[in-house]
Structures are given as C-alpha cells and as structure tokens.
C-alpha cells in the first residue's frame, strides 16, 4: 500500500514525515507546473491525502479518482462551496473520504467539550458564546475551518454568527482557538493551542488507518467517525456521544 500526499507545505511535509517514520511508502507532491495533477502520477497510490489549497481540492480528487484511488483524507479547509459536488463524485465512484477542518486528536476532544459546554450553558441560561482564533499570517481562510466547525457545534444551542468571530492573522502561530461562554457574573473559557503540525499529522495517520481497516460507505465521513471507533475500541461499553442537538 502506498500513500500520496498532495501539497508540500508545512502540513503535507509533516504528514509525509509521520508516514515515513513508521515505515509506510509515501510520496509528497507539490503543485505541478500545469496547476493540475496528472492522474498518471497518482496511479501508484491506494490512498491520497490532500493537504494543498481549497481551490485545488475538486481537481485533486477528480485526478485521483481517475487514477483508480478510492480512499482519501482531505486535510484542507475552505472548500465548503464544492463539498456537495466532491461528495457526489466520491459516491458515484465508490470512494470514501475522511474530511476534517482540524485532524488533531486534541481538536476532536476540544470540539466535543465545546459542544457539551454549549448545551449546558444553554440549559442554565444567561450565557453568550464568543470565539477568538489566531493563525499564522499566511493562512488564507478566515475564519479558520476549525472556527467554522465550532460555530456549527455551538449554534444549535446558543446563537453565534461567523462575522462575530475574532480573527487574528499574525506571526507563525500554527493554530489557537479560544471559546468563551460569558454571563453577567462569570466567564467559562475553553482553549486549544497547536504547538506544531505533528498533532495534525497524528490525526491524519489515524484517518488513514481507519480507511484501510475496513470497507467504508462511499462518500464523505467526518473525523468524528474515526474518533468514535478509536474511543469505542479503547473503552468498550461506554457512551461518549455528545448531547443531542435541539430540534430546528
């Protein structure tokens, strides 16, 4: 089995190095001169990791599908506008992809803690949510994919809009997110800070292993499915689900 990582930026290199360190066959490919990957260059891979740019995701997936690849991990954010069409292409070809705004294991825990906190804060009453996110100057999307996922998880319980997220783009910070639930006399804060990209690489490896462990339903799978299986295997018989979202 061989993995091809599309994108030779910091994230792509980190994922490639993590795969190499455990003895996996991997090739990291940067952006081709033509701007599009030739499917023939992807023919050796049984799994493709996309760590490129948002606008490249649909073409990258199409090229890999044409090459015969049927397993994907998409670690790129900011391509929500093409998510439906990418999902349709995956389903029509029998391919499966794990997609996440943030593949770090700690981020998976953080997202669940935030969702549980939002449910509790809404039940108690009197709290308003706030999000602050800080990334390196060069990060293109704003708010970050993780911030948008935080909004998606908080909003069913406590109303919050993307234009209310405080966004900082400065320095070389890999990723920092703070979520606050503020009331008249107190504030609850939950914070996640990525020190480097090794955490994202660890999550990518977990997603890769999950896809190869068993046949998966064609289409897009959230990283939560990977997390659920990891937790279930480690603590059988225990329920780790987040609270049910209120009816719309």
What are these regions (language model features)?
Residues 2-6, 10-42, 55, 125-247:
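C-terminal substrate-binding/catalytic lobe of Rossmann-fold NAD(P)-dependent oxidoreductases
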């Amino acid at each position: 089995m061989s993995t091809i990582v599309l994108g030779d930026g910091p994230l792509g290199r980190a994922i490639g190095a993590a795969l190499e360190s455990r003895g996996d066959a991997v090739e990291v490919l940067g952006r081709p001169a033509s701007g599009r990957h030739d499917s023939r260059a992807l023919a050796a891979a049984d799994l493709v990791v996309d760590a490129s740019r948002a606008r490249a995701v649909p073409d990258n997936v199409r090229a890999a599908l044409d090459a015969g690849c049927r397993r994907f991990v998409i670690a790129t954010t900011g391509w929500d506008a093409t998510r439906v069409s990418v999902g349709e292409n995956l389903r029509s070809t029998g391919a499966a992809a794990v997609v996440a705004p943030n593949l770090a294991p700690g981020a998976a825990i953080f997202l669940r803690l935030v969702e549980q906190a939002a449910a509790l804060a809404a039940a108690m009453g009197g709290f308003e949510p706030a999000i602050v996110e800080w990334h390196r100057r060069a990060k293109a999307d704003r708010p970050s994919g993780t911030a948008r996922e935080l909004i998606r998880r908080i909003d069913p319980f406590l109303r919050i809009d993307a234009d209310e997220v405080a966004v900082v783009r400065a320095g070389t910070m890999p990723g920092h997110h703070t979520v606050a639930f503020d009331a008249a006399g107190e504030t609850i804060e939950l914070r996640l800070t990525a020190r480097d990209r090794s955490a994202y690489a660890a999550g990518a490896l977990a997603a890769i292993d999950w896809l190869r462990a068993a046949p998966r339903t064609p289409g897009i799978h959230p990283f939560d499915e990977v997390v659920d299986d990891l937790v279930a295997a480690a603590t059988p018989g225990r329920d780790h689900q987040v609270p049910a979202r209120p009816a719309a």
